[in-house]
């Protein structure tokens, strides 16, 4: 198994893969160049907190996917960027015949695993800490596991949950939904925050496999989640 760290500006990848000499860093660099070039011409794409209307047809794949995920999740395109880079990086490795790859990009994960794997849940919760994770059964298809927080990280969030973790077939969608649902984690106490976020999740049930919401001493979930297990404490580079 190969382990690799890739740091390119705001992209911080931790990679575990069964592929040697995968050239993923070069692939991600090209993705970032396409994204940065598009942003210079389309400030709304970069700055909007809502989906952006467009009529362009000749777009690079990363821009297309971010537009699509944004429209599904009712967030701005950049709310989906980290998950999209993870998703496309995983697709690239799968195209090279990988059967086991985990790509973590600042807490947004894309994974394919032909054997059992454990994925940590980063919440920084004062009670749970960073010592729990999902035990993932072997699967042949990609899975996105993305987390948003109102308390940690540099991404914009209007809610106050310790963490909202979304599991979806596409990491770009999981990333956008984590942002959208986390924005609704508001209320006079942690119970209300979890309840309001769960209510918001109901509007997107066709897009996710499961959602886990952690706020202080309250935890809520919707959909089908993997088994939650205890892990060693870990940190994520945001």
From Swiss-Prot:
Transmembrane segments: none
Xref: InterPro entries: ApbE-like_sf, MA1715-like, UPF0280
SUPFAM superfamilies hit by this protein: ApbE-like
Family per record: Belongs to the UPF0280 family.
Protein name (record): UPF0280 protein Msm_0088
Organism (species): Methanobrevibacter smithii (strain ATCC 35061 / DSM 861 / OCM 144 / PS)
